[in-house]
Amino acid sequence: MQKAGCRLEHPSATKFRNHVMEGDWDKAENDLNELKPLVHSPHAIVVRGALEISQTLLGIIVRMKFLLLQQKYLEYLEDGKVLEALQVLRCELTPLKYNTERIHVLSGYLMCSHAEDLRAKAEWEGKGAASRSKLLDKLQTYLPPSVMLPPRRLQTLLRQAVELQRDRCLYHNTKLDNNLDSVSLLIDHVCSRRQFPCYTQQILTEHCNEVWFCKFSNDGTKLATGSKDTTVIVWQVDADTHLLKLLKTLEGHAYGVSYIAWSPDDSYLVACGPDDCSELWLWNVQTGELRTKMSQSHEDSLTSVAWNPDGKRFVTGGQRGQFYQCDLDGNLLDSWEGVRVQCLWCLSDGKTVLASDTHQRIRGYNFEDLTDRNIVQEDHPIMSFTISKNGRLALLNVATQGVHLWDLQDRVLVRKYQGVTQGFYTIHSCFGGHNEDFIASGSEDHKVYIWHKRSELPIAELTGHTRTVNCVSWNPQIPSMMASASDDGTVRIWGPAPFIDHQNIEEECSSMDS
């Protein structure tokens, strides 16, 4: 009080706390009488008249006294003092005329033959600090916080302070929990940019033409890249070194590969081509064999695909008005006429498909009851979009506008991210990092931009590519790994700075201070 200028809790409450923890029940009961004027109902009952208020307060005091005496009774029983316990039951608890059903239960504990039996039947920790602390937690609910501090209040405040610092840390990208033991309270929490995936770990050069798309598998162990050179390359991620090596090359996509989708269990890949492509390829990832090559008509344009969560169906479409639902053998299950599709996404409900179209909107299509509804409306063409894991947020790449974040539940534009150069090329952005706290996108100025989800300004601009960066994919299982695909024919793998090399990091990753 003298140093901080504020009172922690009422002196009577402090005495009450100490006497309860010491098991001095007579003194605790006297303290309770002193606290009587300060008692209130935890349910904030609105009462009328002085008599009703008095009766309500009296009832609360009785409840608190009952809890005290119950603990006293159980401790006597555990100590083998049956006569003293019986005295408490008959002469102190019963006269309160409160919760007679509980009185009957308590009386049954007299038949317990040993302490272990008592603790098991009463679901009670036994005499000591643990059970008395629980008792205090219950008693505290009847006292205002200004009279008695809520349980573990200091720990709560410290944890909130740590959480706030982490929320404000632009580069926080770890799975550390909020346990106070895992952080230092001596200094503010700050993550170094060197721990962030803004340093080139590896450059993949096996493609011999523009690389249009890249996507990590759902389990994070593989990366698929699609190129104008007509191939899909599947890369294996080393679990220890996080380096990638070529696993399989899938060939034969005559028009090139502009979009790839992993099945939910990562056993299949579906690959699409650019606007002139009427074919879709379904590959078995493990064997490298082509399971299905689907084409409904040579007039079709199949440029986007999305898997149903059941892994047995997928939807595909394009800007010439095709919108199909198919099985794994390429059989047409359903179709929607006249929808000029730019990008697709299947929601977790297993029946709703989101599709961006040439009317600068995203609509939801239900293939079961054939209903549709407008969800997002933009003023410029939506070139691509992706959905967060929880299905709440949509990340859009909008022609001439850049990257926009929408809340699908409230159907509102949340944020416009600055910095990226977006014309009419199709650029694919992504959510990423721990808890999907970050957003990354390619750009026509040859850079990869990274934002914290809550900040409009980029926190990092990654340089190294020499032409447009078409796609960025964040590893869903390794928050410190990201891949980018570019028209320069390369795929770059980004990760933290090596511990032994701290030179030239500023050239690889420039941070924008907000």
From Swiss-Prot:
Primary subcellular site in the record, as a coarse category: cytoplasm
Cellular compartments annotated: Cytoplasm; Nucleus; Mitochondrion
Keyword annotations of the record: Cytoplasm, Mitochondrion, Nucleus, Repeat, WD repeat
Statement: the UniProt record of this protein carries the keyword Cell division: no
WD-type repeats, residues: 206-245, 252-291, 297-337, 377-416, 419-461, 464-504
Domain CTLH, residue spans: 9-84
Database matches in PROSITE patterns: CTLH (PS50897), WD_REPEATS_2 (PS50082), WD_REPEATS_REGION (PS50294)
Database matches in InterPro entries: CTLH_C, G-protein_beta_WD-40_rep, WD40/YVTN_repeat-like_dom_sf, WD40_repeat_dom_sf, WD40_rpt, WD_repeat-ST_regulator
Role according to the record: G-beta-like protein involved in cell signal transduction. Acts as a negative regulator in MAPK signaling pathway. Functions as a scaffolding protein to promote G beta:gamma-mediated PLCB2 plasma membrane translocation and subsequent activation in leukocytes. Core component of the CTLH E3 ubiquitin-protein ligase complex that selectively accepts ubiquitin from UBE2H and mediates ubiquitination and subsequent proteasomal degradation of the transcription factor HBP1.
Oligomer status and interactors: Forms homooligomers. Identified in the CTLH complex that contains GID4, RANBP9 and/or RANBP10, MKLN1, MAEA, RMND5A (or alternatively its paralog RMND5B), GID8, ARMC8, WDR26 and YPEL5. Within this complex, MAEA, RMND5A (or alternatively its paralog RMND5B), GID8, WDR26, and RANBP9 and/or RANBP10 form the catalytic core, while GID4, MKLN1, ARMC8 and YPEL5 have ancillary roles. Interacts with DDB1-CUL4A/B E3 ligase complexes. Forms a complex composed of at least WDR26, a G-beta:gamma unit, and PLCB2. Interacts with AXIN1.
Protein name, as recorded: WD repeat-containing protein 26
